[in-house]
Each structure stands twice: as C-alpha cells, then as structure tokens.
Amino acid sequence: PPPASSIRYAGVSPEIGLSETQQTLVRNGLRGEIEVQVDGQLKTPRDVIAMALLGAGEFGFGTAQLIVLGCLLMRKCHTNACPVGVATQDPALRAHFRGHSQYLINYYRFMAEGVRELLAQLGFTRFTDIIGRTDLIEIDADKFTEKTRHLDFSRLLCSGEFAIRRPASQFPSVTSSIAGGQHHLIEDVLDRKLIA
C-alpha cells in the first residue's frame, strides 16, 4: 500500500492543472468538444468564478457538502466510525446524524446567488461567457510579500491561443467552452439500420 503521506498530501492545486488543461485543449482546437470539471477546495462563489475563469464549466463539491450536513472533519470517513453519523453505516453512529436535505438546498441556493452577483459585477449575464476568460483575472500586487513578489503568473493566466509562440491566425476557430452539440459523424452507421 502507498504511504499515508501520499494519500493525504498528494495532488496538485486545481488552478495549475485547470490552466494547463484549458491551454492544451485550446491550442489543439479541442476545447469545444468537452466539458471540463474541477473539484478540490471549492467552498465559495468566488472559488467557482475563479475556476470558471481558468476554464472549468462543471464543479464538484465534496467537503463543503459534508460540513453543511454536520461533518466535524474527524478524517474517519474510511473507517466507518464517523462520530456524527455522516459517513458511516453503523446504526448506532447513524443515530447521531442531524443533517437535513434543506441544509444542502440552502447551501446551493446561496452559492448560485453568489455566483450570479459576481457575474453581474463582472458585467456578464451568462455563466458560460466567462469560461476560460483569463483576461478577466487581475493580479493584486499589493498582496505580494517579499517571498512572493517575484512570482510570474503569465504562463498560468495566458489563454491557449497565446500559450505557444504562433500568430493567432494559425489557430482554428475555437471557443472557450462547448458552443454546440458534438458531431461524431455516426448518423449513417450500420448499427442504426440494424437496431431499427
């Protein structure tokens, strides 16, 4: 089995992986073919907007949902010994569960309202219009410290068209997200006739 430290601390920041994925898909003319999903430490509407600006169109929430339902972050989910009954099948421990579905409904309602408010502040009405718009991200130099002032975010925040040194005219027409349905050219395959 892998060491416990690998289980607990392995991984990469979603910002880095998401930015690289977006740029690679755009450079290869494939961005309009898939929907990119991100998860990991998404808690607030600002987190959702930040991930969308970097290229995500779908979002996974895990820990936030557990906390809304009463999780105390005991890190015992995999042991079937959750003391508040969120992640256990033990009837005695499940009796401690105090969560309600309405708590999750409220969480997502407030999340959606917050995302709408931030979209309005950015001047957009549709969420899909901000997907992959790294040009809207501004670096706040006042937040830098002595150790962080030399960080260069240009490669992280560039759009895919300019991620490699080629004129934009050499790139196929791309969209930052799925603009329409996918076309797999399977309308006339033999299976359609055999199954019908």
Predicted feature descriptions by range:
Residues 1, 124-185:
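Terminal amphipathic helices with adjacent charged low-complexity linkers/tails
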Residues 1-95, 99:
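Glycine-rich phosphate/ribose-binding loops and adjacent secondary-structure elements
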Residues 1-26, 161-196:
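Non-catalytic terminal/interface segments that mediate subunit docking, oligomerization
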Residues 7, 16, 34, 49, ...:
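Weak global preference for isoleucine
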Residues 15, 20, 33-35, 58, ...:
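Glutamate identity and glutamate-enriched acidic tracts
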Residues 67-134, 138:
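Active-site or pore-adjacent capping/gating segments
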Residues 93, 115, 127, 153-157, ...:
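Generic structural signal of hydrophobic/aromatic residues within well-ordered alpha-helices
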